[in-house]
Amino acid sequence: MAKPLSISSHPSIHLAWRAYFEMTKPKVVALMLLTVLVGMCLAMPTILPVKPLVAGLLGIAMMAGSAAALNHLIDRRIDGMMARTYNRPLPKGRVSATRALLFAALLGSLGFVILYVFTNPLTAWLTFASLIGYALIYTAYLKRATPQNIVIGGLAGAMPPLLGWTAVTNQFHGHALLLVIIIFLWTPPHFWALAIHRRAEYAKVDIPMLPVTHGVEFTKTCILLYTILLAIACLLPVLVGMSGPLYFVCSSLLSTGFIYKAWQLKYQDCEGLAMQVFRFSIYHLMLLFMALLLDHYLWA
């Protein structure tokens, strides 16, 4: 009698799906979806409509996963030379370049159709523009062309709150752009801190990250300046009446913490501080947007 098929009897199938899932950068996409959700919620004074909520999150997630897979594909050579990324699916041969391209194309196409049909064309095209901005303009060109790669390319990564806003309103709004500004200013210190820690690897693969081209001390100064600019930007939702006291308190505490970590990085010679700044920046963004969400429903 033939044995029934199961995933456990075919571990290679399970490993293959894990490789494709890994290429979508699920942790990065999860944080991005939080900012999308906050954009949606802040756009609506009442409960979110189900269809644009579900379709918007699903479609944006799929297109973000597609962009991440294209990033894996384009960076496969340098990924194989860096300790942080050498174990990714393409450098290890777990997924071929052809299959990675087909996977990214299929995932992105499905996401676009979902957004276009079940959300609105505006959100579909804006998300597509973000995909092109991240996967092609940033990854394929800017990353290798200029030490300001993160600053210029960061605009594509700052779009999610706007995508969430348009998904439920089908229109632009100045408040959504404030959220974009916050993420835009958050991105450089976040990535530059990682680049300081990995500067030798970036130099090895000829990626002109700021610590490689301008030195560590200059980069530390830039991180500190950007955290101060970010702190100012984080106050804008309060100043325009978009958010209330709860967000103001949380934002002030988080900004103070971020500036303190950046100050430590600049003026204390301590091993591991760059990665502390990098990790703190992730918590900063996550908690900041959670505070925006909670404040919206408590003070709306």
Curated annotation (Swiss-Prot):
- Any one GO BP annotation for this protein: heme O biosynthetic process
From the Swiss-Prot or TrEMBL record, state where the protein is found: Cell inner membrane
Its top-level enzyme class, in one word, is: transferase
**According to its record, how does it sit in the membrane?**
Multi-pass membrane protein
* Enzyme Commission number(s): 2.5.1.141
Q: Which GO terms describe its molecular function?
A: protoheme IX farnesyltransferase activity
| Catalytic activity of the protein | heme b + (2E,6E)-farnesyl diphosphate + H2O = Fe(II)-heme o + diphosphate
PROSITE patterns reported for this sequence: UBIA
Q: Name one GO cellular component term.
A: plasma membrane
Which top-rank group of organisms is this from? Bacteria
Q: Give, as in the UniProt entry, the pathway in which the protein acts.
A: Porphyrin-containing compound metabolism; heme O biosynthesis; heme O from protoheme: step 1/1
Q: What keywords appear on the UniProt entry?
A: Cell inner membrane, Cell membrane, Heme biosynthesis, Membrane, Transferase, Transmembrane, Transmembrane helix
* Keyword set includes Magnesium: no
Q: What else is known?
A: Carbon 2 of the heme B porphyrin ring is defined according to the Fischer nomenclature.
Per its database record, what is this protein's job? Converts heme B (protoheme IX) to heme O by substitution of the vinyl group on carbon 2 of heme B porphyrin ring with a hydroxyethyl farnesyl side group.
Q: What is this protein called?
A: Protoheme IX farnesyltransferase 1
Its source organism is Shewanella sp. (strain MR-7)
Source lineage:
Bacteria, Pseudomonadati, Pseudomonadota, Gammaproteobacteria, Alteromonadales
